[in-house]
From Swiss-Prot:
One Gene Ontology MF term: structural constituent of ribosome
Protein name (Swiss-Prot/TrEMBL): Small ribosomal subunit protein uS10c
Species this protein is from: Mesembryanthemum crystallinum (Common ice plant)
Single Gene Ontology BP annotation: translation
PANTHER family the UniProt entry points to: 30S RIBOSOMAL PROTEIN S10 FAMILY MEMBER (PTHR11700)
Listed SMART domains: Ribosomal_S10
């Protein structure tokens, strides 16, 4: 039903002039893209108001075509669409950096890892690199259960735990100076550093 009515709407300007089913009797020479699209949109909006929002028509063109053509009276422009297809592609370069350094720090002691994070952030900021972090990752707890007694009395036990604290730092758009300053850092021995490029 919807397909046949849609084809009737699209091909109605092409109807023969002696047909009695169409009262307007349009001429084929007066047919233009703008008028047929506006008739189609008007008919669809009158037939079902609930589906009017889903019947948007978008026309896309290559940048060369847009620059070479001027907007004439027969060109169709959709109202209400402020976003451009070209603008979306241009922003994707700014969102995802081409190169980044991801530094993951692990330590059993919080003051050591905080001091190391501060040194890395200062070294990156002095070379004008953009930084993200330090992001505290979840602390991993390894619990060891040991019997107090060497032989019997299994009810009495010691519970030992080792907590591993983690931090994550991203350095976006690093330069050669940034990498040199990071290599010169003297971090404490109790901090495990993992670097990914």
């Amino acid at each position: 039903m919807a397909t046949s009515s849609l084809s009737t709407i699209v091909f109605s300007p092409l109807a023969l002039s002696n047909s009695s089913s169409f009262p307007n009797k349009p001429q084929v020479s007066n047919l233009s893209l703008h008028s047929s699209l506006s008739n189609l949109r008007r008919t669809l909006s009158h037939s079902s108001p609930s589906s009017s929002s889903s019947s948007n028509v978008r026309v896309f063109a290559a940048p060369e075509v847009l620059e070479s053509q001027e907007t004439g009276p027969e060109s169709y422009v959709e109202e209400g669409s402020e976003t451009s297809a070209l603008g979306i592609g241009a922003d994707s370069d700014q969102m995802a950096p081409k190169q980044k350094i991801r530094i993951k720090l692990r330590s059993y002691w919080v003051p050591l890892i905080e001091d190391s994070c501060k040194q890395i952030m200062d070294a990156a900021r002095t070379t004008n690199a953009k930084t993200m972090g330090p992001v505290p990752l979840p602390t991993k707890k390894r619990i060891f259960c040991v019997l107090k007694s060497p032989h019997v009395h299994k009810d009495a036990r010691f519970h030992f735990e080792i907590r591993t604290h983690q931090r994550l730092i991203d350095i976006l758009y690093p330069t050669a100076q940034t990498i040199d300053s990071l290599m010169q850092l003297d971090l404490p021995a109790g901090v495990d550093v993992e670097v990914k490029l």
